Amino acid sequence: MKIIADENMPYVDVLFGELGEIEYVNGRTLAPEQLADADVLLVRSVTQVNEALLCQNQQLKFVGSATIGTDHVDTAYLKSRGIPFTNAPGCNATAVGEYAFIAMLELAQRYRQPLKDKKVAVIGAGNTGTATARCLEAYGVEHRLCDPVLAAQGDNRQFYELDELIAWADVISLHVPITKGGDHPTWYLFDQQRLEALKTGAWLLNCCRGEVIDNRALIEVKQRRVDIKLVLDVWEGEPSPMLALVPLVDIATPHIAGYSLEGKARGTFMLYEALCRVMGKTGENSFHSLLPPFFLGSMQVRELGDERALLTLCRTVYDLRDDDIHFRQSGTDRLGFDKMRKNHRHRREFSALKLENAKGSEVNWLSFLGFSNVG
């Protein structure tokens, strides 16, 4: 069995090597002739999977995408050909939620405005939005959710209207899929009018899709309104962001908010499990066997004096400033953007760090934030 896999997808050898012959490809430049004799295709969001890509293949048995979203896959076409498809919903939700939370702490420290004093709007309450809200809940930050799609589907959480939240929130964190049609399109959800409506001193974070914000309008508004603080992990026109925008952003990274080792491993492992089911096999690998040990065995934390101490603890696991610096130095062009994503292998989630003697102490809440608690 021939398996075509994106070269930037981790743990493919370990997991899929037992199932067939693996050939790695550049997911962004993948061509139909490269898939002519493939049995399995494993992709990320940079590959458009559609009839044009698969036109030379008549034997494909499985397509897997190690992503939360599916907007890059023509699922209707795959269904018409009887090709099983799976993605990895929620695989990197924890990583995205922790990224957003750390970014808020970084802004709070930089501008001496405690996050605890902020009101946060989480726009999009799916996997990543829920993970962000979970971090805010653990720390005791007032927050509200907006998700008209989930509200219409009967989700029993309390939701608010978007424009109501724009007027209310000090911080807005975006976690929606990109859609152009339907009752609630998200393409340019934040257009010039909504950007102008942001509260004085508002923080705007985008960890979902670049085109959820009109980036040209954002440049124009930000040049006039220096009070607005920006965190952008995603950009309109990726992998070539508008260069005029980058210097205006407080924290800038190349679409790596979900790029933790745990998230990457979880995504690939979910595809492995799905393919095993399609083949009627029992997988021989386990998820936890994929992860290397954290550089710290454990840490004693009996108290956190202030928000700076919390940020220091978070930086022990992931220092977002490093990626911001690296991106500005070498990641803003097409090649640098993709290279940084490809080589991003250092990020861990809070759960990698074990806290000793935290149970029953005043920092027991850190387990709800995601840190491992060993007693």
From Swiss-Prot:
Matches recorded under InterPro entries: D-isomer_2_OHA_DH_cat_dom, D-isomer_DH_CS, D-isomer_DH_NAD-bd, Erythronate-4-P_DHase, Erythronate-4-P_DHase_dimer, NAD(P)-bd_dom_sf, PdxB_dimer_sf
User: What are the GO BP annotations of this UniProt entry?
Assistant: 'de novo' pyridoxal 5'-phosphate biosynthetic process; pyridoxine biosynthetic process
Give me the residues that bind substrate, please: 45, 67, 259
Q: In which pathway does it act?
A: Cofactor biosynthesis; pyridoxine 5'-phosphate biosynthesis; pyridoxine 5'-phosphate from D-erythrose 4-phosphate: step 2/5
CDD domains for the chain: ErythrP_dh
**Sorted UniProt keywords:** Cytoplasm, NAD, Oxidoreductase, Pyridoxine biosynthesis
Gene3D superfamilies from the UniProt entry = 3.30.1370.170, NAD(P)-binding Rossmann-like Domain (3.40.50.720)
Q: Give the residues the record marks as binding NAD(+).
A: 147, 233, 258
Tell me the active site: 209, 238, 255 (proton donor)
Q: From the UniProt record, list the coiled-coil ranges.
A: none
What are its E.C. numbers? 1.1.1.290
Q: Which GO terms describe its molecular function?
A: 4-phosphoerythronate dehydrogenase activity; NAD binding; protein dimerization activity
**What does the UniProt entry say about where the protein is found?**
Cytoplasm
Q: Per the record, what are the reactions this protein catalyses?
A: 4-phospho-D-erythronate + NAD(+) = (R)-3-hydroxy-2-oxo-4-phosphooxybutanoate + NADH + H(+)
Tell me the subunit arrangement. Answer: Homodimer.
Q: What does this protein do?
A: Catalyzes the oxidation of erythronate-4-phosphate to 3-hydroxy-2-oxo-4-phosphonooxybutanoate.
Q: Which family does it belong to?
A: Belongs to the D-isomer specific 2-hydroxyacid dehydrogenase family. PdxB subfamily.
Know the name of this protein? Erythronate-4-phosphate dehydrogenase
